[in-house]
């Protein structure tokens, strides 16, 4: 449940919003015993945000800021009795921001650059002695995308590069969608990934994937 206010001023759009996500996706964690089904917990939290867009000729600028209050985070807690550490959840506050620009080279080509980052606020102050936040308290990504619509829209080429802001991982992809007839369309894609051992994408280091999909409409 929430509300939004929007203003449009000479090529710019500005909006403010607030919402309470009481039906948000459940937060899952491993059972304390280490065996059995995962434990679920309601992940309701308050979300406040602001968004601004500005068009300057062929250039579109955008900025989004979001504040999340009492969002659940996984924390590793050491036992004072010398038992094995266990994973618990704590409600913490998070701040995120996204900035981007999109430039229309012509009617068929455009290029987009975006940067996003998020961080837990006062994460160290929220943790007691013996508690450690699982994962990074701050993370971010940069995205560069080029797209070209060819043959009167029958073919669409897209080249995408995505990297973590700390350069711990890099993903590159090339895709081509082509409409053969009114009933047939084909999509091909190549994805290459590089990641450091401590990255969330470590299992995909030096990974190369190729795929093709044929769609028939009738």
Model-derived regions, located:
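Residues that define the transmembrane beta-barrel architecture of outer-membrane proteins
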Residues: 1, 42-48, 55, 91-97, ...
